[in-house]
Amino acid sequence: MILRTHYSGQISADMDGKEVMLAGFAHEIRDLGGIAFLVLRDREGMAQITLVKKLLGKDVFKMARSISRESVVMVRGNVKAEAKAPRGYEILPTEIQVLSAAQVPLPLDPTEKVECELDTRLDSRFMDIRRPCVLAAFEIESAVLCSLRDYFHKKGIVEVFTPKIVAAATEGGTDLFPISYFEKEAFLNQSPQLYKQMLMGAGMDRVYEIGPIFRAEEHDTRRHLNEAISIDLEVSFADDKDVMEILEEAVAGAYSYVADNCRRQLEVLNMELEVPRLPFKRITYTRALELAEEKAGARMQWGDDLDTETERFLGESIGEHYFLIDWPSSIKPYYTLPYEDKPEICRGFDLMHPRMELEIERASCRERV
């Protein structure tokens, strides 16, 4: 049995007179006596359902006006163009079904008119996700991954899926989650790095993975998460310049895709998305230290890692996405390839966000073995 023919965002005033079926949540009900308005919310927005007593009949009207907020409802009705309605149309219902009545009082207010504590949100997470701003974030995340997968596919990069239960660390053993694996100790994987390198040796040439990573580290900062979705890329027969070109095109393409396809979600979040210009700037580590000293008075020794304040300053000064290149070999992983004529400098780089004070991507050419 079909319970929905359209989402609210698919309906317009041009469909005047057309019968539709909507399904979603009772977001709000305004009772004005002989007429009432039910605002139905689905994942694409909201639709105004106009309840007229003389058209619905006494019993149906009484039932409809008593629907509790956040109940799951199905509405069959006809579209009517109405300039005063929020989206330029209203639905005159011929049938209303309550598929699941919400218990009252609600644990939180999905209309966001009443704020609530984080603990309350997490205790009733399914209700919290109903909030338009939270749902918009999920939809934008989906759009970003869709754009990246499409770009990688066009570049001939193969998507792979590597094990998430491993016997040993891939990047040091201090930040692994241990688990029991059939009476043996195993760990949740913190990176697919070793598997990607194995696939390079197997001749797959270009691979990527989008999947979860797990790190047992302090998580009370914006730089650390115990669980996250990681986008990992590995390319053979290429140098650092080739990889930077792939990354900047992929990132700028994702921005552009979201700007074009997630306008409603961005509006819900009150965000204006600026698509970064190509190519991204290349700033050497040495030049970054000079900028920090010239304009912020920061004094750092060559070979020091950049701290949060320096990265924040650089982002504000440069004002756009940029690559931080030519790092000291001593502060990059051992497998990072150094320049032959300057072994103290390596061919590793970070893709930096101008306002988040952190790297979007950390990459390098691998040492030849």
Task: State each model region's role.
Residues I2-S236:
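Class II aminoacyl-tRNA synthetase-like tRNA-binding/catalytic domains
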